[in-house]
Amino acid sequence: KGQASRNFHDWSRKYQVKDGNQTRMTLLNNWEATYFDFDEAKLVKLMDDAVELGVDMFLLDDGWFANKYPRSGDHQGLGDWDETADKLPHGVGYLTEAAKKKGIKFGIWIEPEMVNPKSELYEKHKDWVIHLPNRDEYYFRNQLVLDLSNPKVQDYVFGVVDNLMTKYPDIAFFKWDCNSPITNIYSVYLKDKQSHLYICLLYTSPSPR
């Protein structure tokens, strides 16, 4: 009983998951504790709690980015990947260093393939989203899906990850989220009968396996 699922798990650990047979790290995620309402002091206190619990990693979830439209909720800021100055005046580096001093690893939340209409990115590049020109846009979690068939969008998504890893090499983990299905299915970049290429290009983005 249950042998099929156990066989699948064994196959996944052996062939699909990186270091699948190693012990998994435990983590404390700030999301349920703070949602979007946090600052440096709250996060460092949660790190102390993580250390006390014997947890291996602290994960900073959604809400740490954007300044023109600060990420105070899920209705704005997605796409603008600079630290919110009011929440994190010393930047992500301050938090990675705090975690390092406490002997735990640091992870961070991203969702670079999505965008809020209320964001600087959308204001500059409305043509970067998947949408049907002759229909109203449909929003899921107040966001739209970026068109990864467009090389400029591919470069942008890669740049989000590359910039964080370059600036903050002590980031040990990305929680790469995907909070919207693909709606508004149409690419203004691709020619007719080529929209399946979105999926092909999604698979070439730098998402961890």
Language model region names:
Residues E40, V44, A85-P89, G93, ...:
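Non-membrane alpha-helical structural segments and their capping/turn regions in soluble enzymes
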Residues K68-Y69, V115-H125, P181-K191:
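Flexible glycine/acidic-rich beta-alpha junction loops that bind and position SAM and/or redox cofactors
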Residues I110-E111, R209:
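Acidic carboxylate-rich catalytic motifs and surrounding loops in phosphoryl-/glycosyl-chemistry enzymes
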Residues D74-D86, V188-L201:
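Glycine-rich tight-turn/loop motif centered on a GG-T
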Residues P112-N163:
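Active-site-adjacent "subsite" loops/lids of carbohydrate-active enzymes
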Residues D56-D62, G159-Y189:
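Active-site groove signature of glycoside hydrolases
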Residues K1-G107, E113-V115, E120, F140:
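Conserved structural scaffold segments of CAZyme catalytic domains across common CAZy folds
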Residues Y203-P208:
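Conserved small/polar residues in nucleotide/adenosyl-binding loops
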